[in-house]
């Protein structure tokens, strides 16, 4: 069918598999639909509506033509692109890009608006706000339950983003209440569906919203920042929307969650490295401990070649795969040059030590900083952030020469990506930790988020909206050049572009050390403090409670995409708590490795050695949980269809705990000393755990042929 030319009256089947079918009719009311074999209900979207040259134009299409595809991508997804001219504005063309696979019911699609060659028009905002409707969808077929799912509420108590769910009642539809999403799920008698968009922000800030109506419809519309007023559109300079997601499954919420989780793990991104369940070590907590507990007053004192090489050796004993050098390794931002005072032989010697152990290197970066004296700044002077006409002031980044904030929504993004590619090739860096990225701060008319024909406020909104799309472009450029590369976006503070968009390219660094004293209304003077600003920095159960909060996402989004670090410190009970926590997916270790006793190193090495034999199974398994985070007991079961996986039982009180697994299990590969495992007639495990004090019990299951 490649190149087939159709009138808009025909249905174009893009993917007619057992997983999903996507049809484009191109009509105003029936523009694009998603259906599922064996399910009567379908998701039908109306045509998008743009404001072009001051007039509202519905993008119903004439003469739809496939111009590309189906093209099979590396993640077993096929991409096709279809175009047609707008009936009501014939000099405009709309492209519809669809990604689908017979292996997942979740479909991604986006729109691209361009002009006919030799013509142009503008996207306008006659009412001084975004005038863009992405489509309306009838959800009347799913009346059992409708739920808004917010992924971006920042919880000050855990000092992390949290998942929350909000019912969308019939009264909400009657009163045309708007919901921010980014996901809405709807459940009927025999099927369930979801609608979602890929963007990012911290609630309640939103750039798009789902508007309900008494007719049982959802209209997804732009709120602000989706495009700058007077945005020129030509044949070469097309306007491209964000990606949207839709899915239908047989069953209910559990089946929908499992399908979406599998989509996020395998089919959402082409950058497969971000989904690998490596065990990470990061130097930052050791640097913090030295400043506050070592009384050095300096985050950088420990960071030198000798110390790093010693820590690499210990990390290898513990079972770490990726060793991340946090702030301290660079002499200046922008060019990201190694600090030769701390590392007189460069980082090549660290690279060689890591190679010897079969480990990988990671480094810290801030994409929004460039030293004034750097070559990067010289090449990208016009990309410096400005706000209200004032350039970013000069400031020092971790005691390095003066830097200025630089805008990623500008041509600079390519230069930054290419510099990281150079570093990756030189030092075998596969992991990039990105930190310090505020979503706000630039309204310059000289970048790629609006020009002088619109207002400062409009350009600032567009910067905030576009930031995550440009971050993803950087990640994708890096991963195209460095297969297996991983970019981790630190969202441990508020005001960052958290949502579904970045997950199409990378993963999140979810939690640092939890709340500050000030979050708990405890007076803390940042200027004169002599104690650590974080409350939960000690071994034991409490810090792990906070860091496990991100496991709430695991039902829908795999926990491997939310990196958290756990402490390997004695006593034994704390070691088990932290081991069990990181095995559930967050997969990080930090702290002062040189204070971990030999028996602790052996425990981590043995336990993580066993875990690595089943970690792919653990990552793929949908979670079963009994008890809330911090409860006693709090039980997590991660057993894959083949019976491999693990169970972790946390308890805060002395006494016995018994648990029967929901799934049949393979033989025991490794277990902690405080658990007895039996098997029932169905092959499920009966776990009898004994706790003398707060601790965790861990058991890992694996078939012999899996080892």
Question: Where in this protein do the model-derived segments appear?
Answer:
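C-terminal beta-strand-rich structural cap/linker in extracellular carbohydrate-active enzymes
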Residues: 678-707
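Aromatic-lined carbohydrate-binding/catalytic grooves of carbohydrate-active enzymes
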Residues: 277, 281-418, 429-431, 439-443, ...
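Polysaccharide-binding surfaces and accessory modules of carbohydrate-active proteins
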Residues: 23-25, 30, 36, 43, ...
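Glycan-recognition surfaces
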Residues: 371-372, 376-414, 418, 465-595
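Carbohydrate-binding surface patches
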Residues: 176-177, 186-187, 580, 628-669, ...
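Beta-strand-rich recognition/accessory modules
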Residues: 171-275, 567-569
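Conserved, mostly hydrophobic/aromatic
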Residues: 111, 236, 281, 354, ...
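Short, well-ordered beta-strand segments enriched in hydrophobic/aromatic residues
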Residues: 96, 107-115, 644-652
């Amino acid at each position: 069918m490649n190149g087939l030319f159709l009138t808009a009256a025909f249905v174009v089947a893009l993917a007619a598999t057992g997983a999903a079918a996507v049809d484009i009719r191109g009509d105003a009311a029936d523009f694009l639909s998603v259906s599922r074999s064996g399910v009567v209900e379908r998701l039908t979207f109306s045509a998008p509506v743009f404001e072009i040259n001051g007039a509202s134009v519905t993008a119903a299409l004439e003469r739809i033509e496939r111009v590309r595809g189906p093209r099979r991508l590396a993640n077993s997804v096929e991409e096709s692109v279809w175009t047609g001219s707008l009936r009501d504005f014939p000099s405009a063309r709309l492209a519809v890009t669809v990604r689908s696979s017979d292996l997942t019911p979740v479909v991604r699609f986006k729109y691209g608006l361009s002009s006919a060659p030799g013509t142009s028009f503008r996207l306008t905002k006659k009412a001084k706000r975004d005038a863009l409707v992405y489509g309306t969808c009838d959800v009347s077929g799913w009346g059992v339950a409708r739920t808004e799912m917010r992924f971006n509420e920042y919880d000050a108590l855990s000092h992390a983003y949290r998942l929350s769910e909000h019912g969308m009642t019939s009264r909400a539809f009657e009163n045309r209440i708007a919901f921010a999403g980014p996901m809405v799920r709807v459940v009927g008698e025999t099927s369930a569906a979801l609608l979602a968009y890929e963007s990012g922000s911290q609630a309640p800030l939103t750039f798009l919203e789902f508007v309900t109506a008494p007719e049982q419809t959802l209209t997804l519309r732009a709120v602000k920042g989706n495009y700058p007023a007077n945005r020129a559109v030509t044949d070469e300079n097309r306007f491209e929307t964000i990606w949207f997601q839709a899915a239908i499954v047989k069953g209910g919420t559990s089946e929908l969650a499992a399908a979406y989780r599998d989509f996020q793990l395998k089919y959402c991104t082409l950058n497969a490295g971000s989904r690998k369940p490596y065990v990470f070590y990061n130097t930052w907590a050791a640097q913090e401990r030295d400043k506050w507990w070592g009384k050095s007053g300096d985050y950088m004192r420990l960071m030198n070649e000798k110390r790093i090489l010693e820590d690499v050796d210990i990390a290898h004993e513990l079972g770490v795969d990726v060793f991340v050098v946090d702030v301290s390794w660079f002499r200046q931002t922008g060019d990201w040059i190694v600090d030769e005072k701390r590392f007189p032989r460069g980082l090549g010697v660290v690279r060689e030590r890591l190679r010897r152990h079969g480990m990988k290197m990671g480094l810290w970066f801030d994409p929004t900083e460039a030293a004034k004296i750097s070559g990067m700044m010289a090449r990208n002077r016009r990309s410096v952030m400005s706000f209200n006409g004032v350039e970013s002031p000069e400031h020092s980044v971790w005691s390095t020469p003066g830097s200025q904030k630089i805008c990623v929504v500008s041509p600079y993004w390519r230069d930054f990506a290419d510099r990281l590619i150079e570093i990756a090739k030189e030092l075998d860096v596969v992991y990039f930790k990105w930190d310090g990225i505020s979503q706000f701060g630039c309204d310059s008319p000289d970048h790629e988020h609006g020009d002088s024909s619109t207002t400062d406020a409009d350009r600032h909104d567009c910067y905030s909206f576009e930031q995550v799309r440009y971050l993803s472009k950087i990640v994708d450029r890096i991963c195209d050049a460095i297969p297996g590369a991983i970019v981790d976006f630190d969202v441990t503070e508020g005001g960052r572009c958290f949502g579904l968009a970045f997950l199409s390219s990378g993963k999140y660094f979810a939690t640092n050390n939890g709340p500050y004293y000030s979050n708990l209304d405890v007076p803390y003077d940042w200027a004169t403090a002599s104690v650590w600003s974080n409350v939960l920095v000690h071994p034991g159960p409490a810090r792990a409670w906070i860091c496990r909060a991100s496991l709430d996402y695991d039902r829908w989004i795999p926990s491997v995409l939310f990196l958290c670090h756990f402490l390997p410190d004695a006593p034994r009970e704390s070691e088990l708590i932290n081991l069990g926590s990181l095995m559930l997916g967050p997969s990080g270790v930090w702290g002062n490795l040189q204070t971990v006793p030999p028996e602790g190193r052996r425990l981590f090495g043995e336990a993580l050695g066993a875990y690595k034999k089943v970690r792919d199974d653990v990552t793929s398994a949908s979670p079963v949980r009994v008890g809330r985070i911090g409860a006693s007991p709090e039980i997590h079961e991660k057993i894959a269809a083949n019976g491999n996986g693990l169970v972790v039982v946390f308890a805060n009180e002395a006494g016995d705990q018994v648990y029967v697994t929901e799934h049949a299990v393979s033989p025991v590969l490794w277990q902690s000393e405080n658990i007895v495992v039996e098997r029932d007639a169905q092959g499920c495990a009966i776990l009898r755990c004994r706790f003398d004090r707060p601790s965790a019990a861990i058991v890992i299951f694996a078939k012999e042929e899996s080892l």
